[in-house]
Amino acid sequence: NNTVDNIEALFKVAKEKGITVFVSPHYYYKHDLNWEFEGSLETLMHKITMFDRKGALTQEGFEGSGADWLDKYKKYIDGENVIVTSPHKLYGPESNDLALQLRKHGYSKVVLAGMSANLCTESHMRDLVESGFNVSVVKDATAAAILPGLNGYEAALVNFRMIASHVFTTEEVVIEL
């Protein structure tokens, strides 16, 4: 559904309009790889070093790693209107400072997009709604795994429609902003 380009379109319009963007990164450090238990997807992410970083206080090995930003997003994330929160560890923002940053900057409305619809995006939506935020989701600026008998994207769309204040397309958000 053109997720990567649609997320870029959201970054672009936010930059043009001076809208603050909050990025909730997913990082694992060495100590995270020694957990006594984990879910099947966590096991996979750890095995393929999907979001691994050398440490919280170093950029060593970050460039080009699974934790690095997509090249087309770097010019936006390095911009003045972007706040990168502390990392989340599983799927939602319960383990980072996203809600704190939103509140401290005076935001009560969130337009949510992200790479993993039924995991990180949905978990962020649920937690932010439960924390009192007015959350809308951009349904074509997120995607999910589709496997035999498992359609993560369709599952997420059902929950977006049931929980979010509004479900937009990228085109609708760009026009609305």
Language model regions located:
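A short, N-terminal amphipathic alpha-helix
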Residues: N2-T20
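Active-site-adjacent betaalpha module
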Residues: V13-K17, N34-W35, S40-L177
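Short beta-strand segments at enzyme active-site cores
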Residues: I19-H26, V138
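Histidine-centered active-site/metal-ligand motif
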Residues: H26-Y28, H124
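Short catalytic/ligand-binding loop motif for oxyanion handling, primarily in non-cytosolic enzymes
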Residues: Y29-L33
